[in-house]
């Protein structure tokens, strides 16, 4: 189960680790779309709206759990790189204890807040009951979502990105089958979609636990490893909490941008919604690079090989930025046809084309600052990732979207460029932070 990422070709390790991670992200995207697609075949608009609103809430929650779990990936990865099996076991056991307690506490809170959350999302009255039912059932599955992401983080910290891909593939297949059963055959509506999702997560967790117990070359856990240790849990949270907060606040910012677009009218709102879906798919590459740099960088830092960790960063930036430049050039020529894949409304296509041409530049800049974020996590400085992302959101993304929407009512192009400008600011902050850390000799955990 454990894979040594501290030897051999750096670029080869990046490719071998990132491709399963990329496919995992793709499957998670497919997993999230399945409920919406299937209920659209069997339910009315209120049912579709309920699942749409509920899935947005669950997407934000899942991203925050994944961000929090980054603390486990990095700390376990550093221990594995240092060949310290006892420390790796201690971090693994404490991670499981910590997240079990947190998930149970959060589940109780979310169940009590299901209806207020649906209200905050401005859910239409016709879809309110379905949305609340969807959220309550999905909230019951929060411990399962947490368990899957923790197990996946443990595997990735060990250098294995393939098994988490298999686990999400199992969940995706089971979810689709159960959706057709509960929504199509049993006509359970949004509640059926939520039940299918939750049971699919349960199956995935069961499979992942079975694999974890039977895998050779893994971490041997003892009862003492699960006993809470303040220093261990504190380090996991110091890395994970900034990433979780960052991901949650970024999603809130995107909701603000959606509100701004909605105020421009139905056509522009539809165009922005479609382009966001396209961009979220293209961002799978930068996202996989972030996670790859975190895992590979952590192992190499733990092994006392900071030069290899830096090489991982530079190679990943080259891949992500190269992809961004390529896709940005292509989109300049095919923006309208790409938008037209999602709608036959000529007005929406005409509005979405310019927005996509501006927004697509974000792929170039995001590819760079995502990789820096992964590196900052690997060296235990995830607060830097939080700072540059939130600064960009507060100073550029949201105000830029508002101002361009107000002063350029005839086109969405400036609004798309405002988003890319936010990522450019993030890149500038990341480069400055990196240079400052290097000048003061703080590119290793605990230095300075």
Label every model-predicted segment.
Residues 22, 26, 30, 34, ...:
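Generic alpha-helical transmembrane segments of integral inner-membrane proteins
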Residues 1-18, 76-143, 185-241, 297-362, ...:
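Short alpha-helical transmembrane segments in multi-pass integral membrane proteins
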Residues 48-108, 145-164, 271-335, 366-385:
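Small-residue-rich hydrophobic transmembrane alpha-helices
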Residues 7, 11-30, 34, 57-64, ...:
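Residue-level signal for short hydrophobic patches within transmembrane helices
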Residues 30-49, 118-125, 181-188, 248-281, ...:
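Helix-terminus/linker motif at the lipid-water interface of multi-pass membrane proteins
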Residues 138-156, 164-172, 193-208, 287-290, ...:
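Short runs within selected transmembrane alpha-helices of multi-pass transporters and secretion channels
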Residues 16-35, 137, 171, 200-204, ...:
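Transmembrane helical elements of multi-pass membrane transporters/channels
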């Amino acid at each position: 189960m454990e894979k040594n990422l501290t030897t051999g070709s750096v670029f080869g390790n990046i490719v071998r680790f990132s491709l399963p991670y990329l496919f995992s992200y793709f499957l998670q995207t497919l997993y999230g779309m399945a409920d919406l697609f299937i209920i659209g075949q069997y339910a009315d608009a209120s049912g579709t709206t309920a699942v749409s609103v509920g899935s947005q809430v669950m997407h934000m929650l899942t991203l925050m759990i994944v961000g929090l779990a980054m603390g486990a990936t990095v700390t376990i990865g550093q221990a594995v790189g240092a060949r310290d099996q006892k420390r790796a076991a201690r971090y693994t056991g404490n991670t499981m204890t910590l997240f079990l307690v947190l998930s149970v506490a959060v589940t109780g809170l979310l169940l009590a807040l299901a209806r207020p959350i649906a209200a905050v999302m401005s859910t239409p009255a016709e879809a309110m009951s379905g949305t609340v039912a969807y959220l309550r059932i999905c909230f019951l599955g929060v411990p399962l979502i947490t368990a899957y992401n923790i197990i996946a983080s443990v595997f990735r910290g060990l250098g294995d990105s393939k098994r988490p891909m298999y686990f999400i593939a199992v969940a995706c297949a089971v979810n689709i089958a159960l959706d057709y059963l509960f929504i199509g055959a049993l006509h359970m509506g949004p509640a059926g979609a939520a039940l299918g999702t939750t049971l699919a997560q349960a199956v995935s967790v069961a499979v992942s636990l079975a694999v974890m117990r039977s895998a050779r070359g893994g971490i041997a856990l003892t009862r003492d490893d699960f006993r809470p240790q303040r220093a261990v849990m504190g380090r996991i949270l110091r890395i994970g909490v900034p990433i979780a907060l960052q991901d949650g606040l970024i999603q809130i910012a995107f909701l603000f941008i959606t509100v701004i677009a909605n105020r421009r009218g139905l056509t522009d709102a539809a165009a922005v919604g479609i382009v966001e879906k396209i961009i979220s798919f293209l961002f799978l590459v930068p996202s996989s690079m972030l996670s790859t740099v975190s895992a590979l960088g952590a192992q190499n830092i733990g092994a006392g090989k900071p030069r290899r960790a830096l090489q991982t960063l530079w190679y990943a930036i080259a891949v992500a930025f190269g992809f961004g430049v390529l896709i940005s050039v292509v989109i300049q020529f095919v923006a309208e046809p790409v938008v037209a894949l999602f709608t036959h409304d000529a007005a929406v296509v005409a509005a979405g084309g310019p927005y996509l041409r501006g927004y697509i530049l974000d792929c170039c800049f995001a590819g760079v600052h995502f990789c820096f974020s992964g590196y900052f996590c690997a060296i235990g400085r995830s607060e830097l990732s939080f700072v540059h992302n939130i600064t960009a959101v507060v100073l550029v993304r949201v105000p830029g979207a508002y101002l361009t929407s107000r002063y350029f009512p005839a086109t969405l192009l400036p609004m798309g460029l405002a988003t890319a400008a936010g990522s450019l600011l993030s890149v500038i902050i990341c480069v400055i932070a990196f240079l400052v850390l290097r000048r003061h000799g703080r590119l290793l955990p605990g230095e300075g």
